[in-house]
Amino acid sequence: MYEKILIRYGELTLKGKNRDSFIAQLARNIKLITGEYPETKYDRMFLTYSDANLEKLQYVFGITSYSPVIFCENNLEKITNSAIKLVNKDDKTFKISARRNNKKFELTSAEINQKVGASVLKHYPLIKVDVHNPECNINIEVRSDKTYLFSKTYEALGGLPVGISGSTLHLMSGGIDSPVAAFKLMKRGLKVSFLSFISPPQTDEKTIGKIKDLVSVLSKYQGKSHLYLANYSKLMNYISFTSNESYRINLMRRSFYRIASKFAKGKNIMTLSNGENLGQVASQTIESLSTIASASDLLILRPLIANDKVETINIAKQIKTYDISIEKAKETCELFAPKNPVTKPNLATALRLEEELTQLKDLEEELLANEIEHYTIE
């Protein structure tokens, strides 16, 4: 019965001169995820109808909603026959919502509502009109060349098309927060690449598999993803010799940021991102965040900075990362955590401790040159 899927985009129409580039990016993303370029018409997009496409469109950012549609000629009889097809025999109430964009059509929107509604009542004698809360709302749009009709609307993700806002290198862990942060960054139009620090043999194949599984789930929302695994074992062992054990996590995370910044620049990525949340752990106090962030000269995006944990968990369940995130696995930060981590670190102290670790920068350069593996995940 259905011929096409009508795709609506919201924020994109508000972007003025950039509108064409937004629409083009959205079309490319739809092609990437469904395998088919949509047709753009009437400030809408149209994609071939299939159950597979209906399912895949729920993963495309930039779409506000979509509906399976029937096309017909601008002829009242054809419109009426198409409308009758959209009524389910079990529907008890209905409404006709007509919109006449083609002012040359002989009937007004109100007249279309009346005449098509009368025909539906005649065809289904037991059905009743309910203009407030109908079980079946038949939408009719009369355009210049044809009319399209639909009764079902699927809510979509909204946001902006992935890639329109640039790209970010996301410091990825296997916890609950990090994948949710990546999802939110994609929703604001960023293409996300992933960098994860591992420390074999302490972090085993199960840990690596968990991270790959999380990136695989997230790839449904942006298409092909790049995952980089950095072997941090030598550096972790070296930093453990710091003269102030309470600064161990701060020194490690500062090292993460130095490495990530250089690596990102090499990939022409100008922002870093993570799943940090204010005050959640010792390394996420204002003082810790400030001390750690000063190791990078790139913008650091923290989309979860003010989230409640419950909010983050709810999103994780929605996007199907939660069950993977709660699987038991050894994380580099957990393995390295001191008994009493400093909660209000001082930058001057961190810099002094780094100076004592005379081989630190050389080991970071060695990691960048030899210890990063690349995976493409779809």
UniProtKB/Swiss-Prot annotation:
Domain THUMP, first and last residues per copy: 51-153
Keyword set includes Transferase: yes
Keywords associated with the record: ATP-binding, Cytoplasm, Nucleotide-binding, RNA-binding, Thiamine biosynthesis, Transferase, tRNA-binding
Enzyme class: transferase
CDD domains for this protein: PPase_ThiI (cd01712), THUMP_ThiI (cd11716)
InterPro entries: Rossmann-like_a/b/a_fold, ThiI_AANH, ThiI_fer, ThiI_N, THUMP_dom, THUMP_ThiI, tRNA_STrfase, tRNA_sulfurtransferase_ThiI
Pathway in which this enzyme or protein is active: Cofactor biosynthesis; thiamine diphosphate biosynthesis
SMART domains the UniProt entry points to: THUMP
Entry function: Catalyzes the ATP-dependent transfer of a sulfur to tRNA to produce 4-thiouridine in position 8 of tRNAs, which functions as a near-UV photosensor. Also catalyzes the transfer of sulfur to the sulfur carrier protein ThiS, forming ThiS-thiocarboxylate. This is a step in the synthesis of thiazole, in the thiamine biosynthesis pathway. The sulfur is donated as persulfide by IscS.
Name of the protein: Probable tRNA sulfurtransferase
Species assigned in the record: Mycoplasmopsis agalactiae (strain NCTC 10123 / CIP 59.7 / PG2) (Mycoplasma agalactiae)
Gene: thiI
